Amino acid sequence: MTDRLELLAVVALGFLLDQVLGDPHWLYHPVRLIGAYISFLEKGIRKLFGEGERALLAGGVVLVILVTGTTAVVSGGILYACGRISPWLRFLASVILCYQLFAVKSLKDESMKVYRELKKDDLEAARYAVSMIVGRDTKVLDMTGVTKAAVETVAENTSDGVAAPLFYMAIGGPVLGWVYKAVNTMDSMVGYKNDKYLYLGRAAAKLDDVLNFIPSRLCAWIMIFAAYLPSKGHEFDGKNAKKIFLRDRFNHASPNSAQTESVCAGALRVRLAGDAWYFGKLVKKKYIGDDLRPVEPEDIRRANRLLYRTSWILMGICAVWEAAMEILSKL
């Protein structure tokens, strides 16, 4: 098996494992280790560099270098060590590393917990469930706010949890995929524009913006295509998805977050985003989409169906890409 075909095989098997297993609670996910490592380094960097603006900016660069470097060395080291024992063990380790980079089923499972609590009219339980998958303050959300938060998370993470990892795995295998995941984890932990992380997290946030630039836009166009495909009850509006994407794709502080959110809002014919509370402070945000109908809990299920459609199309494109590169390499 050539390197290209082996890469396609491990990525495809990892994708299929995620579809079946998701993120079982009994399996310790490497992202937790990365998160613990980031927290450990943050404390050390603050002590070593101090709390000045320039010091924290420099410390943020060091944080990025250490986290990405360590992630690359550890993931690459695992594959190298396994390869020394057996090619098949390396293959198995590669599949597992790729599998843990995807977040399709876990995203669906966690968002559907929100859906089920909303259907029971249990606002407190729904707030708690959505707090597990969003970074905003959830105690102030009403039923509509909880629903919107869940839909937005599914839409945004179609890129962060599927398209971007797949993009970097297709280029550099599981090691590059995990470097991306490390940057994305840093951004989710220290990439906030508040007093605590404005300077320390800037390097991580900027690098995350760069790494997600192409995948988020690729994912948005694939999601538009997915919205155009026939659906039961015509639940997706492909034409409106494209319209809202072209109009609202930059209605977010991040250059990438609104790319897929705008497509989802258009496809569902609802209005997402708007002002939100973070760490006890109200953050003013632009709306995404038109208020053509009220957001309802069923939109969480619809967003998940759009997530799955988009994910399978992306995997298909990856397979075609790797096969084409294999053919071209032999010409």
List the predicted regions and their residue ranges:
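Hydrophobic alpha-helical transmembrane segments
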Residues: 1-179, 183, 191-331
